[in-house]
Amino acid sequence: MGEKEMRLRRCCFTGHRPEKLGRPEAEVIKSLEREIRSAVADGFQTFISGMARGVDLWAAEIVLALRDEGASIRLICASPYQGFESNWSTAWQKRYAQVMEKADLVRYICPRYSRDCFQRRNEWMVDHSARVIAIYNGELGGTRNTLMYAERNQVPVVHA
C-alpha cells in the first residue's frame, strides 16, 4: 500500500494541555473516546499522537486501550524531539514513557528543540492524516495553528 492509501486510514489529534482546556477533563476524555470509536467505525486504522500533556496523551491512551480490547488499530507517537517531556511532572513523564513503549511506531520529528519544532510536528501529523480530531477552546496558539493548517490542506476536522 502506498503512502497516499495509508494516509486515507490515518487520523491525528490536536488539542490543549490540561490547564487550558476550559472543560472538565472527564468530559474531554469521553468526547475523545467517542470520536476515536467513530473514526475506527469509519475505517481509520492508524492514529497519530503529538504526545503533549493533555489531549494528545489522553487520545493515545484511549487508542492503546481500544487496541488492547481487540481493535485492529495502530498508534504512531510523533514526538517533537527526544527529551520533550523532561520538564514535566513525574506522573506525566511516566504516562509519556508508557505510551511510547506501547506505540507501534515512534517518530521524533526534529533532532533537537527548535523554535518551530512544535509547528513542524503538527504539520507532519496533518500531512500524514486524512482526519483531525480536535479539542479546541477558541484561543490563539498551536491548536489553532494546526486547525488552520488542516483547513488550508483540506484535511477534515472533527471537533470532539
Regions found by a protein language model. Give the residues of each.
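Acidic/glycine-enriched connector segments
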Residues: G2-A160
